[in-house]
Amino acid sequence: MTRGLVFFVSAACGVLADQLSKFIIAANLTPGTAIPESGFFQIVHVHNTGAAFSIFRGHTEWLIAASCLGVILALTAFFLRKKLPFLDTRPGVAALGIILAGTIGNLIDRVRLGYVTDFIQVGNFPTFNMADSCLTLGIIWLVLLYLTSSHSGGDASENA
């Protein structure tokens, strides 16, 4: 599979998983409902007008603009990846793809609904969704790829 295909398939699968999971939650749980009602792990239907940890709550226009910038940055990084060897690998473009997926997933919600649907609650950590998970895991993955390639003096492994 080419790097371009890895990037776009990663992004498409991430957006699909995010939007499908949010559709299932919205169709089956009213906002504020939790399953189970208490416990360390819950599925909770929450409307979040902010960003991570509900920062910038109520500033949807700014968050839409920031998300559009995020999409542009992810696409730019993909198209300029040859300048950063750790990005020009299948793992590098897959990580960029899931970052793009997370950005687009929440952007779709903000434009369509004016809020993001969050539903995963673990302990006292703020409620989040699949798009948030894509963003977080993609960024961690890119950092690890960068650290691995920088410390080894070469490119990140093509098959990592």
UniProtKB/Swiss-Prot annotation:
Its EC number is 3.4.23.36. The keyword Cell membrane applies. Keywords: Aspartyl protease, Cell membrane, Hydrolase, Membrane, Protease, Transmembrane, Transmembrane helix. GO terms for biological process: proteolysis. The chain crosses the membrane at residues 60-80, 84-104, 127-147. Pathway: Protein modification; lipoprotein biosynthesis (signal peptide cleavage). The keyword Membrane applies. It is found in: Cell membrane. The active site is at D118, D132. GO terms for cellular component: plasma membrane. This protein specifically catalyzes the removal of signal peptides from prolipoproteins. HAMAP family: LspA (MF_00161). Belongs to the peptidase A8 family. This is Lipoprotein signal peptidase. The gene is lspA.
